[in-house]
UniProtKB/Swiss-Prot annotation:
Nucleotidyltransferase recorded as keyword: no
SUPFAM superfamilies registered for this protein in UniProt: L21p-like
Protein name: Large ribosomal subunit protein bL21
Keyword annotations: Ribonucleoprotein, Ribosomal protein, RNA-binding, rRNA-binding
Top-level taxon in the UniProt lineage: Bacteria
Function: This protein binds to 23S rRNA in the presence of protein L20.
Organism encoding this protein: Prochlorococcus marinus (strain MIT 9312)
UniProt KW Cell membrane keyword: no
Family listed: Belongs to the bacterial ribosomal protein bL21 family.
GO terms for cellular component: cytoplasm; ribonucleoprotein complex; ribosome
Single annotated GO MF: rRNA binding
Region ranges (Disordered): 115-146
GO biological process: translation
NCBIfam families: L21
Length: 146
């Protein structure tokens, strides 16, 4: 009997860089140059958006897991379009009564494209040390007794 699982099947379609991020109260598996439909964002088309709530980041050499988020990791997104999802029908009825109610809902979505995933270092802090100012206090004079 042969093993049908190959090591190449376990890879992520040849992409060695991906990230799991949190947006709109959900977690998404993001890969570079792919489209994703997420809940409506308040942004115009062609706008750039940065996600900083990265839960996991995998690159060629390592996997970084955040506690809860990966520090200094970013995902750059570009808004492609705004659209509406398929209609979901909700049908409510009360048995033995003539009460029926049919409603529909269409979720507002934003289609985004992942431009880059990066684990950048934060901007270097200035090398100047903070100087502490010491106040000189006068010693308390002894109380005079008259």
């Amino acid at each position: 009997m042969t093993n049908s699982k190959n090591s190449s099947n376990n890879s992520t379609n040849g992409n060695e860089l991906y990230a799991i991020a949190e947006t709109s109260g959900q977690q998404f598996w993001f890969e570079v140059n792919r489209y994703y439909d997420i809940d409506r964002l308040n942004a115009k088309e062609k706008d750039k958006i940065t996600l900083e709530k990265i839960l996991l980041l995998k690159d060629k050499n390592s996997i970084t897991i955040g506690k809860p988020y990966v520090k200094d990791a970013k995902i750059e997104l570009e808004v492609v379009s705004h659209k509406r999802d398929k209609k979901i029908l909700v049908y409510k009825m009360r048995p033995k009564k003539k009460t029926r109610r049919k409603m529909g809902h269409r979720q507002e979505l934003t289609r985004v494209m992942v431009k880059s995933i990066s684990l950048g270092k934060s901007a270097p802090k200035s090398s100047a040390k903070k100087e502490t100012v010491k106040k000189e206090t006068k010693p308390k004079s002894e109380k005079s007794t008259n």
